Structure formats: structure tokens, C-alpha cells
């Protein structure tokens, strides 16, 4: 039995968001095809994720030295630890994001910072950093109003590129994407684009 974290980063649901519609189709099909697997939904817009700030950095330093943390430091450090442990407990990750300003919502970066921890998801060695998530799988579903997979705007895309890079850095060997794009550039194709993405999501769910 595998554990899947379904990690969404959109303020709207599948009735409004193309990425959330594809994500919903993927998860529903996945659960039908893998009834024994556990799926946990993490809505990043409804989840408290401490940013790495002065309290967190000071708290980590105090922990290393065996010193007592303040209440705020303890609360933030403990919450980050819980997020990390939940991430480590899973076998597969499905990220659902929109493209915002060429990347993704800031809550995604906060979550990535929470799970990118030396000694846990990667380690330093004489040969350089080494990823420790060598038995995990990732799917990224992202919706973009324009066209960024290829063409003149391709070099501007920083969301999927960053997520793929950080997951490779963490050692993840399998990274899949479902990219939904062009519905703002060609509004007359909106329903066709959405239907294609849902179909692609359902197909991938059977083998993911």
C-alpha cells in the first residue's frame, strides 16, 4: 500500500480552476484504480506553513546547542517538523498549482522550504549534495493562461522548472507533468484544453 500526498495550491476549486479540475480527475481515478492506497489532501491555502524567519533560524540554532526555545520558536519549529515528517511518510506526491507571475503561488515555496532539510531529504558529502528521496514519485499539474512549454515565452517559465529542479536535487527519480496551457491566449479553445487535461489526468492516474 502506498501513501499519496495530494498537495494543492489554488484558492479556488475545480469549478473555477483548470488545474484543480485535472487534479480532481486524477485523484478520483487514482483512488478507483488503487483502492488500497492512502490519499491525504493538503490544501496549502488552508494549511499553516511557517516561513523560515528569525524565530525558526534561532530555534534551530538553540536546538543544536541544547538551549530552551521561546514559545514562538517552539511552535514554528515543531510545526515545520510535523510538515517534514508527513512529507517523508509518503511515497508519491501530486502537486497542483496555477502559474502566477511565471512561477507558482508563494505558499508552494514555503512548503518546499519546509521539506528541503539537510539530513532529512538531502545530505552534504565530499562529492556535493545528495538527494535522499530516491524511492519517491512526483506529479505536477499546472495551469497556464499562455503558452510556456515551447515558443518565445518558454525561457520565462519558472514554476515547473523550479519544482522539477528541487525534486531532482532531493533525489526523486520519477517526475511527471500535466501542463494545461493556452486558455487565455485562445479563449475559444478553453473547453477543449480543459477536457484534454482531464483525459490526460485520468490516463496517467492508472499507471502512476
UniProtKB/Swiss-Prot annotation:
A GO MF label: oxidoreductase activity, acting on NAD(P)H, quinone or similar compound as acceptor
Organism annotation: Staphylococcus aureus (strain MSSA476)
Similarity annotation: Belongs to the azoreductase type 1 family.
Keyword Transport: no
UniProt catalytic activity: 2 a quinone + NADH + H(+) = 2 a 1,4-benzosemiquinone + NAD(+); N,N-dimethyl-1,4-phenylenediamine + anthranilate + 2 NAD(+) = 2-(4-dimethylaminophenyl)diazenylbenzoate + 2 NADH + 2 H(+)
The protein, known as: FMN-dependent NADH:quinone oxidoreductase
Function: Quinone reductase that provides resistance to thiol-specific stress caused by electrophilic quinones.
Chain residues that bind FMN: 17-19, 99-102, 143-146
Details of cofactor binding: Binds 1 FMN per subunit.
Amino acid at each position: 500500500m502506498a501513501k499519496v500526498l495530494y498537495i494543492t495550491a489554488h484558492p479556488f476549486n475545480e469549478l473555477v480552476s483548470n488545474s484543480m479540475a485535472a487534479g480532481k480527475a486524477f485523484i478520483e481515478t487514482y483512488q478507483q484504480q488503487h483502492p488500497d492506497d492512502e490519499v491525504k489532501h493538503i490544501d496549502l491555502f488552508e494549511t499553516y506553513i511557517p516561513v523560515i524567519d528569525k524565530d525558526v533560524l534561532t530555534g534551530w540554532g538553540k536546538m543544536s546547542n541544547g538551549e530552551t526555545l521561546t514559545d514562538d520558536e517552539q511552535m514554528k519549529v515543531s510545526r515545520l517538523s510535523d510538515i517534514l515528517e508527513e512529507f517523508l511518510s509518503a511515497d508519491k506526491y501530486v502537486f497542483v498549482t496555477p502559474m502566477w507571475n511565471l512561477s507558482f503561488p508563494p505558499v508552494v515555496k514555503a512548503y518546499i522550504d519546509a521539506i528541503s532539510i539537510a539530513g532529512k531529504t538531502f545530505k552534504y558529502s565530499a562529492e556535493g549534495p545528495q538527494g535522499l528521496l530516491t524511492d519517491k514519485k512526483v506529479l505536477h499539474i499546472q495551469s497556464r493562461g499562455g503558452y510556456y512549454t515551447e515558443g518565445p515565452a518558454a525561457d520565462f517559465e519558472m514554476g515547473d522548472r523550479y519544482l522539477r529542479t528541487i525534486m531532482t536535487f532531493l533525489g526523486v527519480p520519477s517526475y511527471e507533468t500535466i501542463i494545461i496551457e493556452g486558455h487565455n491566449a485562445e479563449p475559444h479553445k478553453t473547453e477543449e484544453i480543459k477536457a484534454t487535461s482531464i483525459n490526460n489526468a485520468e490516463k496517467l492516474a492508472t499507471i502512476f
